Amino acid sequence: MKDRRIFKRGFVYYADLGYNYGSKQSGYRPVLVLQNNIGNKYSNTLIVAPITTRDKKILPTHVYVGDKYGLDNDSIVLTEQITTIDKSRVFEYICYIDNNAMKMVEKALITSLGISSCACDMLYNSSNELHRKRIN
């Protein structure tokens, strides 16, 4: 059965990330939806970044969002730990992260994924053309 909830980029939910090894975030925790809204509407999965309240070593892939958005504690988005989860593992809506914070998250993602600024400019300027091209 298709999940009928509406998921939007920038929304924060509680989700079950399951059990993971090592330093990867796991368990029931807040996650930030990163995936575009078309993917959110039609896919059975979501691309998310886990959020932690633990003090972490300051990295360029971390975005401090505090507690001003409705999060219970001072929080950090961990863009170096993005993951894809099934919508059935997503539970309670918590809050929405505003555009300014999402821009900071986007910059952290660019850093995390090693995408150069000129590559980003090229993608933004030709995104419609890229969708039309078929890769053989």
Language-model segments: which ranges?
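Short, charged beta-turn/beta-strand-edge "cap" motif at the junction between a beta-strand
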Residues: 18-22
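Compact nucleic-acid interaction/catalytic patches
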Residues: 26-28, 33-67
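C-terminal terminal-subdomain/extension
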Residues: 69-136
